[in-house]
Amino acid sequence: MLVTEKKQEIVNAHKLHDSDTGSPEVQIALLSERITYLTEHFKTHKKDHHSRRGLLKIVGQRRGLLDYLKKKDVERYKSIIAKLGIRR
């Protein structure tokens, strides 16, 4: 799981203004970090199907946020894709 310090570091890197914690960019970055963590987890725990379902749910959430951002502002979408290295 994400430690509070790591989560705060991600929020600070992607926030749009001082008190920003809920913008799509921040949410996408946090979900991406959780996806990375779970992907590493599955390299050692191949039979953890319960968590794998959670991973698919998180990937779907991130996909929805990315679709929303693409529809709302294409430049911000391209920026976050490039910054996080998400293939799309």
From Swiss-Prot:
One of its Pfam families is Ribosomal_S15
Q: Which InterPro entries match?
A: Ribosomal_uS15, Ribosomal_uS15_bac-type, uS15_NS1_RNA-bd_sf
**Gene Ontology terms: cellular component:** cytosolic small ribosomal subunit
- Keyword annotations of the record: Ribonucleoprotein, Ribosomal protein, RNA-binding, rRNA-binding
A biological process from GO: translation
Family per similarity comment = Belongs to the universal ribosomal protein uS15 family.
Query: What's this protein's function?
Result: One of the primary rRNA binding proteins, it binds directly to 16S rRNA where it helps nucleate assembly of the platform of the 30S subunit by binding and bridging several RNA helices of the 16S rRNA. Forms an intersubunit bridge (bridge B4) with the 23S rRNA of the 50S subunit in the ribosome.
The protein here is known as Small ribosomal subunit protein uS15
> What is the gene name?
rpsO
